[in-house]
Amino acid sequence: MKLLVVGASYRTAPVAALERLAVAPADLPHALARLVAQPYVSEAVLVSTCNRVEVYAAVSGFHGGLGDICAVLAESTGVPPAALADHLYVHFDAAAVKHAFRVATGLDSMVVGEAQILGQLRDAYHWASGADTTGRLLHELMQQALRVGKRAHSETGIDRAGQSVVTAALGLATELLNSDLAARPALVVGAGAMGSLGVATLSRLGAGPVAVTNRGADRAVRLAESYGATAVPIADLTATLSTVDIVVAATAAPEAVLTREVVTRALADRKPSRGPLVLLDLAVPRDVEPGVADLPGVQVIDIDRMAALVANGPAAADAAAVERIVATEVDAFLNWLRGADVAPTVAALRGRADNVVTVELGRLAQRRPDLTDDQRDEVARTVHRVVQRLLHQPTVRVRQLAAEPGGDQYAALLRELFDLEVPQTSPVGTVPEVVVPEAVPPLGGAAEDPSTGGQ
C-alpha cells in the first residue's frame, strides 16, 4: 500500500470553492465508506475544516487511487470533476508524509503555527477509526503526525510566532476599530471549537461584555459560564448585533446566519458613533452572507481576506526549527514504512522454512516409525531451533537494510533468491508519471506533480 493525499486548501481555492468542497460531519461516515469501497483505496481519513478539505488514503496504485478519490469527492460534494480538479493538489508517498507533518505542525496553516489544526486532525482520525476506514498505514501516519505536531509546539517558539486564526482576525479588527478591544462589546455566534476559541481570546484581550449565541442553547450557556460571558437566545441575534462592535461567527450551519436582512435591521438600531460593526467570518460554509460586506458601517473579515492580509510567517528561526523537525520525522517515518514493506517478505520466508520443516518431519515419521513420541518431539525442537538460528541474522539484517533509502532492493533480492510469492507494490519514494484516469479531467495548475513534493 502507498500513501496518497488529495486535497484543496486556502492556498489553492477561494472560500467559495472550499464551501462547495466541505464535507459536513454528518456526511463523513458515508464519504469514508464510499472511499474505501473503491477498488484502489483500502484506508481513508477525510479532513474537512474551514481552510482545507483533504483525503489521506492508502492506495494500491497511484493513478487508480487518484481517480477513485476524485470520483468520490465529486460525488460527495456535488462539485463537477472539472471544477474540482482546478483546485486540487496531490502528494504521493514521501511528499504525502511531509505534507501531513507540515499540516500537523501548523506550517501549512493560513496563520503559521496555529495549534487548532491538531484537534481537527485528531477529530478526523477519530471519525475514520469509528467508520473502520483506517488500517496500519493511516493509523501510524495520524498518530505520528499528532506527535510531531505536539513536538513542534513544545520544542520551538512557533506558538509565540504564529497566532490562532481567531487571534489574527481580532488583530485585524483592532486596526479597523482604530483601538484595542478593551471594553468593546462582542458577540460570538457558534459554540463549537472555533467559537470556544473566540470567547477565550476575546476574554483574554479584555473585550466585554461578551455574549454567546448558538442554535443549541445548552452549549451556549456552558461556554458562556466558562468565561464569564452571557448566553443569549439565537432568537435575539438581531437585537444583540445592534449592541456590539465585534462579532466572531463560527458556526457549522449549512446556510448564512448573518444575512443582509438581519444585519440591516441591526444597523438601524445601532448608533453610527460606535464606529464600524466588524464581522469576523471564520466559518465554512460562510456565516456572513456575501452582500453584507456592501452595507455601510460594516467591515467583514472572511477567510479570503485573512489570506490576503494576515502576515502568516513566524520568526525565521522558529520556522526553520520546525522544518528541521519535520524533515527528521519524515525520514524516521519512511524508515518505518520501508521496514513495514519488507515484513511480508520476511514472513513469507519464515513460512517457507516452517513448511519445509513440517514436510521433512513428516517424511522422517514415515521412514522411522520406531521413534518414540519423545524422540520425535526432540528432533522437531532441534530442527526448529536450527532453522530459526539460520534465519535470525539474515532477517534482522534485511529489516535494517530495508529501512535505509533504497532498501527496497534487499527485500526484492530475498524474494528472488527464495522464490517467494509476496504481493508486489512500488517501493517507497518511487514516483509514477502523473497521468490522471480518463474518468477524471487532468489536474489544474494547483495540483502537484508528486515528483516535486511542492506545496
Swiss-Prot record:
Gene3D superfamilies cross-referenced by the UniProt entry: Glutamyl-tRNA reductase, N-terminal domain, NAD(P)-binding Rossmann-like Domain
Keywords associated with the record: NADP, Oxidoreductase, Porphyrin biosynthesis
One Pfam family per UniProt: Shikimate_DH
E.C. numbers: 1.2.1.70
Keyword Lipid biosynthesis: no
Pathway info: Porphyrin-containing compound metabolism; protoporphyrin-IX biosynthesis; 5-aminolevulinate from L-glutamyl-tRNA(Glu): step 1/2
Important for activity, annotated site positions: H99
Leading EC class: oxidoreductase
SUPFAM superfamilies on file: Glutamyl tRNA-reductase catalytic, N-terminal domain, Glutamyl tRNA-reductase dimerization domain, NAD(P)-binding Rossmann-fold domains
One Gene Ontology term of the molecular function aspect: glutamyl-tRNA reductase activity
Active-site residues per Swiss-Prot or TrEMBL entry: C50
Binding site for substrate: T49, C50, N51, R52, S109, E114, A115, Q116, Q120
Catalytic activity: (S)-4-amino-5-oxopentanoate + tRNA(Glu) + NADP(+) = L-glutamyl-tRNA(Glu) + NADPH + H(+)
GO terms for biological process, alphabetical: protoporphyrinogen IX biosynthetic process from glutamate
Keyword Oxidoreductase annotated: yes
UniProt: NADP(+) binding residues: G190, A191, G192, A193, M194, G195
InterPro entries: 4pyrrol_synth_GluRdtase, 4pyrrol_synth_GluRdtase_dimer, 4pyrrol_synth_GluRdtase_N, GluRdtase_CS, GluRdtase_dimer_dom_sf, GluRdtase_N_sf, NAD(P)-bd_dom_sf, Shikm_DH/Glu-tRNA_Rdtase
Functional note: Catalyzes the NADPH-dependent reduction of glutamyl-tRNA(Glu) to glutamate 1-semialdehyde (GSA).
Subunit structure: Homodimer.
Remarks, miscellaneous: During catalysis, the active site Cys acts as a nucleophile attacking the alpha-carbonyl group of tRNA-bound glutamate with the formation of a thioester intermediate between enzyme and glutamate, and the concomitant release of tRNA(Glu). The thioester intermediate is finally reduced by direct hydride transfer from NADPH, to form the product GSA.
Domain notes: Possesses an unusual extended V-shaped dimeric structure with each monomer consisting of three distinct domains arranged along a curved 'spinal' alpha-helix. The N-terminal catalytic domain specifically recognizes the glutamate moiety of the substrate. The second domain is the NADPH-binding domain, and the third C-terminal domain is responsible for dimerization.
Assigned protein family: Belongs to the glutamyl-tRNA reductase family.
Protein's name in the database: Glutamyl-tRNA reductase
Organism: Salinispora arenicola (strain CNS-205)
